[in-house]
Amino acid sequence: MFDGVHDLKKGIIKTPKDPKITFYDDPLRMMRAVRFASQLNFEIKNSNIEIIKSEKERINIISKERIHEELNKILLSPKPSIGFILLMKTGLLEIILPELIKLEGIDEIEGKTHKDNFYHTLQVLDNICKNTNNLWLRWVALLHDIGKPKTKRYNKKKGWSFHGHEYVGSKMVFKIFKRLKLPLNYKLDYVKKLVLLSSRPVILSSSEITDSAIRRLIFDAGDDIDDLMTLCEADITTKNAKLEKKYLNNFKVVREKIKDVEERDKIRNFQPPISGKYIMDYFGIKPCKEIGLIKERIKEAILNGDINNDVIQAKELMMIVGEGLGLKKYEK
């Protein structure tokens, strides 16, 4: 009756009944249509897209939990860009994730342009999906550049820049997760952290890599260092094969350096060789700011490679720093 088999063979998604009534009765069907298109690599019939455009505001009556469930399913599809391009075309994305819409477009001043960060983001997302099924890492890929519109600047000599977009973007993640009623637990922390660190390996790969810089990267990323590197490799979207090979080789060097430093210095999930209690007992003091200062100096010395990550050298430095702060060994 509705010729559904024919539509399936043609890879077309359309409603069996009047689409206006279908989408009006249950606005979540608009997102489901997009999700099915993304999961199956189907097309939504143009007339249905136009109806979704006209009914898009009704998505606001749907609970945020049901909306983010559909977003998660789109993110977990083989090629999520299909879904997000449809969300943009239908106007749903502007309502659900306006931060992404602001990434679209190319500015030009004096012949100098920047890339379209919306389509770049979708390329990164599709790239990362080839290497991981981790939903939250896919969220990182989707949101890693959302700070760029707020940090976009033009300089006559250097052209366009987005300095600090990682920091700004990481701050925006919380608002997005809260608005969409996504988990505000360790999953949020994971996404925020990787958005914040998203450019660090890129900077390292384009300069001479020092052990100190690698130690700090491992210290900041912890157990998520491998996911961070996967993100950075997915961020290579150049169409120049030689450049792509060069960037991938650079990241390979960074990965090898990470493995090297990690095996030698044991920085991942760093714990101070001596505790605050040990410092208090040694100097016979109560909790105070001096303890934090001593621990910070020890941490910095280890990350800089000035001392090894062990108790003996940490204790020696503790005594020197303590003496400089006017502390003396407590004699019972």
Q: Predicted regions span which residues?
A:
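Glycine- and charge-enriched loop/helix tracts that form the active or gating conduit
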Residues: 1-142, 146-164, 168-186, 275, ...
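Short, mixed-charge aromatic SLiMs
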Residues: 54-66, 164-168, 196-202, 253-259, ...
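Histidine-centered, transition-metal-coordinating active-site segments
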Residues: 80, 93, 148, 166, ...
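Histidine/acidic-rich helix-loop-helix segments that form or flank divalent-metal centers
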Residues: 111-113, 182-245
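Active-site lining segments that contact anionic ligands and/or coordinate catalytic metals
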Residues: 134, 138, 192, 212, ...
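Terminal helices and disordered tails flanking the catalytic cores of nucleotide-processing hydrolases
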Residues: 205, 240-332
